A protein has these predicted regions:
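Extended catalytic cores of very large enzyme megasubunits
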Residues: 1-179
Length: 179
């Protein structure tokens, strides 16, 4: 009841996942079709979005040893849900769009050329799909070489920008190297 109509419209139109989400009944039991397959559809409530984000952030924290106890992890998750629901905090758009789609719903997509630092090995690793290690950052400053077709050049910049734009990020570029 504290959300304005504009905030509600943005949440529903921009941040609710539109497809691939397991549908559940009022008791939380998965709905199945006549073949026994889980029915997939959109997110239908803000609570689903808040759960998707906060449970994933908690999972990542537990996975990397961030919390001293399970109680600390639960408090973190509960406080995040409260802050999101009351609009005390809000992540950037790529977080709303991408975070938790794999962890919460098991969604995968084709690898898109994203890389991440593996928390266990500390090594740069290419992502195996689009959502298990999503690209959650909002803004990137890129450089460009004075070259049309080779790596680091003008056409390569287009590819890098497309990868970032696809998942909701934005970019700026330092063009000072161009003639």
């Amino acid at each position: 009841s504290t959300w304005s109509q504009v905030a509600t419209d943005i949440m529903v139109s921009k941040y609710f996942r539109k497809a691939g989400v397991p549908q559940v009944d009022e008791g939380g039991k998965a709905l199945k079709d006549e073949n026994g397959d889980v029915v997939l559809g959109p997110e239908t409530s803000s609570r689903q979005v808040f759960d998707r984000l906060s449970e994933t952030w908690r999972h990542w924290g537990e996975e990397t040893g961030y919390f001293a106890t399970k109680k600390d992890a639960q408090a973190f998750e509960d406080e995040l849900k409260y802050m999101l629901a009351t609009q005390m905090a809000a992540p950037n758009s790529p977080q709303w769009f991408n975070t938790g789609l794999n962890y919460k719903y098991g969604l995968e997509g084709p690898a898109q050329g994203f890389w991440y630092v593996d928390p266990k090995s500390g090594k740069l690793t290419e992502g195996k799909d689009s959502y298990s290690r999503p690209q959650p950052h909002a803004c990137f400053i890129q450089s460009i070489d004075d070259d049309l077709v080779n790596e680091g050049g003008i056409m390569d910049l287009w590819v890098k920008e497309a990868r970032l734009f696809k998942f909701g990020s934005g970019t700026g570029t330092n063009f000072s190297n161009l003639r």
